[in-house]
Amino acid sequence: MTREDEQLKRWAQYFNDLLNRPPPPDLPIIPEASAELNVNCGKPSKIEIVRSIKMLKSGKAAGPDNIPPESLKADPELSADILYGLLGKIWEEEKMPQDWNESYIVKLPKKGDRRECKNYRGISLMSAVGNVLNRIILLRLQGAVDATLRDQQAGFRKDHSCIDQIATLRIIIEQSIEWNTSLYVNFIDFEKAFDSLDRSVLWCLTRHYGIPGKFIRIIKNSYDKMTCRVLHASGLSASFTVNTGVKQGCLMAPFLFLLAMDWIMKETTREQRNGIQWNLLEQLEDLEFADDIALVSSNNQQMQDKTARLTANSIKLGLHPNVSKTKVMKVNCTNNRPVKVRDTILEEVTSFVYLGSVVSIDGGSDEDIKVRINKARVAFNMLRKVWSSHVISRRTKFRIFNTNVKAILLYGSETWRTTKQTSQKLQSFVNECLRRILKISWTDRVTNEMLWELAGEEPIIAQISKRKWRWIGHILRTPANNITRQALRWNPQGKRKRGRPRNSWRRGVESQTRNWGHTWDTLGRLAQDRTRWRTEVVNGLCSNRS
């Protein structure tokens, strides 16, 4: 298609089909909670409105009402005075303005052929004023609902991150290898998960988790008669209704989606022991970050049973595993029987990109470091005009380098098991970048130490060490039942092989701990004081490159 009007119609048809899925064939019976959550159900106060306005993110495109967040944030108190009556009326009548139920879909390209619609993600541009009310609802509900969610879920939750899940999985793989125990990992991928969730089931889930009826009716009203228009080139498509999924771009969407994922995994693991032994009484069944699920089991049959249960439970909510992207990793396994989703055999892999980081069957991070260097090099080369510019100051160039190149390079470095060889590769790349920014030729007699001083940089291994121990301090401050914190001391039931144990991330951390004259217990007490931890460990011991 070459004509813009034809392309616009095609995009509208694609998103119309995507956002209006058929209902699940077998709707689940989900009981209501015995009591509603104890949260404030009164109409929004001016203090809440001001707080929500201040929390709006700047730089976001305006929705159909053409009101950018900056216009509200310019004077939060005045904006709150204007909105107070409107939001109070909405709260009492439980009806959203029709304009708030319309959104514009902006297409963002993903991997793959950009000539195919399926390789784009749609993000909804919504009313900034509507997001003020959504934020108030979210702040009231989030804490109470969060306390009921499974500990394995780290997505969209306070004090949790991708790094926590990546580190936990790496430790599980490394310890399984060291203790010679079998481990099966199934990386589940869903097809268009946020767009496929059945809404009739979603409202049942909100009652199941005890959300008060006032909130449910207001949220449901914002989804009823919801319409979208697709932005393409310089035009807008015709309006169409949306009946499935949560609004991508809405503040409430991740919160609502977590209810669905939590129910699926609770039903999947209910009265089952198909995970790995985590402590004397509990098994670890999976690690989750929103819809990115890594099932773990100690034998093939357990993994097959759990995969089948997850598939059946997710289909009841309108979600379907993507069999072409769902992969299985086997560590220390002699059983060659495949794991299936329905009748489709899942591909077995020796490495997998989990939450943006490459996790390998040997537990190492060499492959991930190689990928990080390549991605950072691409990012650096894309900014070549910045580095060669005579207008941009050197200070600004280094700020751009840190935020756009080094951030890519060091993503997940907290979990890396670095070696002398990988450290040299990382440092060589950084040195190459610094020399290009500073316009220092290799023929110039400038040592690496002089280069780092000119750039205000530390050696890369020191930077990685600081990031690692800063993150470890955060983990040691979490509750004792935190899964990542427990992983720091977890050992599977098995027997080590004869000979010297291989190096691992955790063994390296424990070695550093002993060299500093500490134990996990003393580090745990030290970490409770953030200032002392930052001064003595992150900026003290790590800077000494111990």
Where are these regions (language model features)?
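Catalytic palm subdomain of template-directed nucleic-acid polymerases
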Residues: 73, 192-209, 245-246, 289-316, ...
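Basic, alpha-helical interaction scaffolds
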Residues: 132, 344-417, 461, 467, ...
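Conserved polymerase palm-domain catalytic core
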Residues: 190-290, 298-300, 326-330
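Conserved catalytic palm subdomain of right-hand nucleotidyl-transferase polymerases, strongest
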Residues: 59-67, 105, 115-125, 163-207
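Catalytic palm active-site di-aspartate
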Residues: 63, 102-105, 121, 153-155, ...
